[in-house]
Amino acid sequence: MSPPAAVSPTTRSVELAAPAVKLPVGLSKNNTTATIEEMEGKWDDFKFAPIRESQVSRAMTRRYFQDLDNYAESDIVIIGAGSCGLSAAYILGKKRPDLRIAIIEASVSPGGGAWLGGQLFSAMVMRKPADAFLREVGVPYEDEGNYVVVKHAALFTSTIMSKVLQLPNIKLFNATCVEDLITRPSEEGVRISGVVTNWTLVSMHHDDQSCMDPNTINAPLVISTTGHDGPMGAFSVKRLVSMQRIEKLGGMRGLDMNVAEDAIVKGTREIVPGLIVGGMELSEVDGANRMGPTFGAMALSGLKAAEEALKIFDIRKKQNAF
């Protein structure tokens, strides 16, 4: 005899009155943030929305590793997030939203030397016509005739950085350094086809730790704007010498603002196939003068680097298929 079939009891929905809950100041009923005006004067009752520590960990980790995956194959890699690199990124990201652009910056704080003017002073001086770029990104300045003055260099750097980071096709990997260049054989000898990366803190300890291999990013085009010679500066061009792609560096000459800025902007170019060099790193290749605390050439060298990149990108992309 078969067991009796189970019969579900008749159910009817019952609406239960939700107990009244006193919402903390700062949250509305649908968990949206209150306005500042609603919070003012009510700090004794203030409370943040609840969170579990693992939620924070997963929110950061998931997004960062997704970025690593997305940008493992980039269209353009920019080494160095100083004024030149950020200016190049801004133009590229704006003109070509279809390109995937990775910026690699060794420091925790991007911006290079553009947070202050000369001798740790605040004001930033740019010679005309670099004021055109300030107007483009919305940085106010005082007009002094042949040059303009931004009241604090950090105003320029924070503004251009905010513009760049809001572009959906650009990812900044800071606290990350480039340890080497990826190369491919080509008719011209060697073509640059990406970068070798590592955490900066790891790179600083290769002498006292072992087995700390790097990561890689493939890209048909690299723009190097790492600054003049230093611990991380002029990295790419120094590596070209050790790879025997260029014979030697010209070495940066003494300070001459009038000569230096024109030379840097005019000289910004593809040094070897797949590698464009701009900013003060270029002075180490060409033996150009240093310019000191005037920043117009850094911004406009970035603009020219972006322009040069767009001229040759399609060619380098075809070459980089394998």
UniProtKB/Swiss-Prot annotation:
Pfam families: Thi4
GO cellular component: cytosol; nucleus
Gene Ontology MF terms in the entry: cysteine-dependent adenosine diphosphate thiazole synthase activity; ferrous iron binding
SUPFAM superfamilies membership: FAD/NAD(P)-binding domain
Listed cofactors: Fe cation
Annotated substrate binding sites: 84, 105-106, 113, 178, 213, 228, 280, 290-292
Localisation: Cytoplasm; Nucleus
PTM annotation (2,3-didehydroalanine (Cys)): residues: 211
UniProt keywords, alphabetically: Cytoplasm, Iron, Metal-binding, NAD, Nucleus, Thiamine biosynthesis, Transferase
Subunit structure: Homooctamer.
NCBIfam families: sulfide-dependent adenosine diphosphate thiazole synthase
Main function: Involved in biosynthesis of the thiamine precursor thiazole. Catalyzes the conversion of NAD and glycine to adenosine diphosphate 5-(2-hydroxyethyl)-4-methylthiazole-2-carboxylic acid (ADT), an adenylated thiazole intermediate. The reaction includes an iron-dependent sulfide transfer from a conserved cysteine residue of the protein to a thiazole intermediate. The enzyme can only undergo a single turnover, which suggests it is a suicide enzyme. May have additional roles in adaptation to various stress conditions and in DNA damage tolerance.
Protein name: Thiamine thiazole synthase
